[in-house]
Regions:
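Soluble catalytic regions of large protease machineries
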Residues: 1-174
């Protein structure tokens, strides 16, 4: 949606920094394979091949549903990390309903489609993710980490998951 469209490359690096920081802070970094700054929006965060794959007929419906719900939470948190980092860290302002409404609506749609979540359940998941991401990016240290990560990404252009995690660790995240 338009709220996640990038104004320029700097905006894009901060969005990617926000997603990466959120993945690591939420302990979901195992899903990340690579970061590509020059990729099209939506393709900058390369996830591991099994992320989003739920079609194994040997898995129980409960396991598949739980995996889908976990991935919805991870994706929601990443989208929120993207916009929160860009707003809090780069623009130095808070979120508005114009920032969050498109993400909330996407969570409702995806939650219904992939997890059979009712609107109130999808909204609760969204609010939990927003609360977590807000707490992460309220720390001034995280602002410094995000800015340094964005600068390094701009210089390198690509990073493996391991390089990104090591960089965040060296910057004090963990």
């Amino acid at each position: 949606d338009s709220v996640l469209r990038y104004a320029d490359e700097r905006d894009k690096t901060f969005g990617i920094a926000g997603m990466t920081i959120t993945l690591v802070a939420c302990r979901d970094e195992e899903f990340l394979a690579e970061i590509r700054l020059d990729a099209e929006p939506g393709e900058t965060m390369v996830m591991k091949h099994d992320y989003g794959m739920r079609a194994n007929p040997r898995m129980s419906a409960k396991i598949i549903w739980t995996q889908a719900l976990d991935e919805l939470r991870t994706t929601t948190s990443m989208a929120l990390g993207n916009i929160v980092c860009r707003r809090y860290v780069m623009a130095r302002r808070g979120l508005t309903p114009a920032d969050t409404t498109p993400i909330r609506e996407a969570v409702r749609s995806e939650g219904l489609t992939h997890c059979s979540l009712e609107q109130d359940e999808a909204d609760a998941l969204f609010e939990r993710c927003l609360s977590t991401v807000d707490r992460i990016f309220r720390h001034s240290t995280v602002h410094q980490v995000a800015a340094a990560f964005a600068d390094e990404l701009s210089a390198r252009r690509t990073m493996s998951a391991r390089e990104a995690i090591e960089l965040l660790s060296s910057l004090g995240l963990r």
